[in-house]
Curated annotation (Swiss-Prot):
Belongs to the PsbH family. It is found in: Plastid, Chloroplast thylakoid membrane. This is Photosystem II reaction center protein H. Disruption phenotype: Loss of photosynthetic growth, cells grow normally on a reduced carbon source. While all other PSII subunits are synthesized and are inserted into thylakoids, they do not accumulate. Changing residue 3 to A: No visible phenotype. It is a single-pass membrane protein. HAMAP family: PSII_PsbH. PSII is composed of 1 copy each of membrane proteins PsbA, PsbB, PsbC, PsbD, PsbE, PsbF, PsbH, PsbI, PsbJ, PsbK, PsbL, PsbM, PsbT, PsbX, PsbY, PsbZ, Psb30/Ycf12, at least 3 peripheral proteins of the oxygen-evolving complex and a large number of cofactors. It forms dimeric complexes. Coiled coil: none annotated. The chain crosses the membrane at residues 48-68. The modification Phosphothreonine is found at residue 3.
């Protein structure tokens, strides 16, 4: 049963100590991007644009899958090891 009488001494953490880090040109260049962290705009923002790109990427993957599965037949596109090995 916990009684709150621990023999462990609490470690004293110096809150004033902060490691300075390394300042690099790339870090200086990317600093404005990090200044916007945590700020959320009201509304949908760019969610609609992101959804459009996700749908386009899904359609691209579906087309690739159909070509690979030979569900989508294209002229001069065949999926066999022999045609992949031919040097044109």
């Amino acid at each position: 049963m916990a009684t709150g009488t621990s023999k462990a001494k609490p470690s004293k953490v110096n809150s004033d100590f902060q490691e300075p880090g390394l300042v690099t040109p790339l870090g200086t260049l990317l600093r404005p991007l990090n200044s916007e962290a945590g700020k959320v705009l009201p509304g949908w923002g760019t969610t609609v644009l992101m959804a459009v790109f996700i749908l386009l990427f899904a359609a691209f993957l579906l087309i690739i899958l159909e070509i690979y599965n030979s569900s989508l037949i294209l002229d001069d596109v065949s999926m066999s090891w022999e045609t992949l090995a031919k040097v044109s």
